Amino acid sequence: MSRLREEILGEESGEDCHVIDLMGFSDEILLHILSYVPSTDLILNVKRACRKLATLCLDKSLTHAVVLHKDYQVSKDKVKQLLKEIGKEILQLNMAGCYWLPSSTIDHVLRCKNLVKLNLSGCHLTSLRLSKMLSVLQNLRSLAIDVNPGFDASQLSSECKATLSRVLELKQTLYTPSYGVVPCCTSLEKLLLYFEILDRSREGFILSGQLMVGESNVPHYQNLRVFYARLAPGYVNQEVVRLYLAVLSDRTPENLHVFLISAPGSFAETGATKNLLDSMARNVCLDALQLPKSWLNGFSLLQHVKFNNPFYFSFSRCTLSGSYLVQKVINGGKDLKSLTSLNLSGCIHCLAPDSFFRKAEDDIDSSILESLVVSCCNLRHLNLSAAHHHSSENLGKHLCQLLARLKHLLSLALPVCSITGGAANADKPPMQSVTNMLPQGFGKKARVGVQTYPRNVEQGHAKPQSSVFWTLLESLLLLESLELVGSNFSSAMPRNEPAIRNSLPACSRAQHVGDTEVAAISQLTYLRNLTLAQLPNILTGSGLIRIGAQCQHLRTLSLANLGMMGKVVYLPAFMDMLKYCKHLRDLRLEQPYFSANAQFFQALSHCSSLQRLCIISRNGTLQSDAVMSFMASCLEVIMCHMFTGESLTACKNLQQSIVRSFQAERPALNVVIFPLLHEDLTEVIRDVPMMHLDEITLFKSRVAEEPPNLWW
């Protein structure tokens, strides 16, 4: 490291080689380079290389904020040494998701006496350790923790409570019915609550939504500006969140400007919640709003609520009509230039004049979408998934053509059926451009019934003249996240329930979306996250190869139910795609009859940066020796989740072999291999670290799921 340098070779014309010594760069350039180095490597390795680096690595710009989140190689000893060397300099410490570190690691946070922000979500933390730590961190203003079974607020010392009384921001994930530390936080301005409480204990007992005996029931919300609650499925979560909301219904904070409740399924409105909503409509001016669908379906709140400069709306799964959306929410297009994130997922009538006498599959009213696009011209994140948004033949008024005006979009979620042509084209039988798929050569004929594809990327799909989807993506060159999900798609692996054995057929218009449309995605140079689900007309997967070759920033890939269900016809092309994915970190693959054999894992081994792998295949098979070889060759893999049709014995043996062989070298290794249709699946899932479960194992739409930068 003392002679960091880069050799720049001359061209074949015989130019001399030039040697650039990186130590000759300015401090500003070197600091920028070092900002990309993980904190542990920076302090424990790079700092020791030479005197200049030793000085630069201790620069405040590098030591004030330390991020250990997703630093999967960090160990207890490394954390101890890191905090020993620079603990006094750290103002922000993010250890979110460090589930593999023992609870004793938290003791070393005591060295960071000047901490202002601390994130311990997903870390093992007891009431006593929390008390001891917070008693020392008197400057703390932002805190994120988990509240697990056994948490006892009575064990918190007076010094700890004094620190909590000064905390302004709290993020709390609840795994047990409790207020946690909320009653102690008397100055709260931002409160984020994640309810992950199961309805049954491990022993099978039904849990109650009542809080533990002795807990204060008076949270202090008077200074609250941001309230966010996200509920996992389950009755207990709903009961507990009502207790948190009860205080809000008595007196709504005057400065409240963000109010978000994300609740799956049915979450009935009560008298208390109705009083809360009425109070909000009278007394506050909001900038962000999300409510359970049953609370919104009456629309009474939206008629009276006042908005200031709204930046986030989520009306996910509600029956909001397009006319109401234009008239009441976007105010005829006058006031929503500030809106940057909009979630209309599952709003099946949001682009139609009304919801009466209308089928979900009927064509949309393009004038409503046009009003939305004009009014919300600065949108960065838009979710229109889980609905049938079919366009008519009106020239220039197709959904894709209208969305192409949103030049600032960074993330977009669309139903597959929305990107096809108008109704006239939809009535034609689906066709793939076979000539585009075949390799060029003398006398090479296509075998009947066997699809082939071009192995040379340059021979891929040319832009069809009439493709509105190609035109859309040509206009969205900044797009980083794209989701194309079938309107009727449901994952075989839902939350807290047995696996789903059957799924609804794809929308008839989705039958016209195939390899050519998938190839259009390759235009997105900056694409980082891609989800494709329920595209039944994928014949060869040739479009995937172009994506792999041209989208070199791709980090997360999720594929589900592509092509025919009985056979993975796109597998050869997919394996060719993987050879290009050198920077891919997360891969989720859901396909009913997927054979994870040696060929597949050999191709996957080209993904040298891969960290997390999840395979879900109801009738799928595994080749154990191929899995072991893959794990040995891909040294970064720390999560391996496979839910297939293999026997319980075979799954357990493979899981034990992986853990036994690689756990010592990979402290964060999390392995779950289990039969998908086994009755104990939900019990196995509950032990998966929430970070992996939420980000990759469970399928969901993530575009505009919550406001951007909700937490630091």
Indicate residue ranges for each PLM-predicted region.
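Short amphipathic alpha-helical/adjacent loop interface patches that line ligand
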Residues: 50, 87, 551
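Short helix-loop-helix/strand-helix junction enriched in hydrophobic and basic residues
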Residues: 27, 42-60
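Alpha-helical bundle protein-protein interaction modules that mediate dimerization/oligomerization
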Residues: 109, 117, 121-125, 133-136, ...
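Core nucleic-acid recognition elements
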Residues: 36, 65
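F-box-proximal linker/hinge
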Residues: 55, 67-119, 123
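C-terminal capping region of solenoid repeat domains
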Residues: 1-10, 15-16, 29, 77, ...
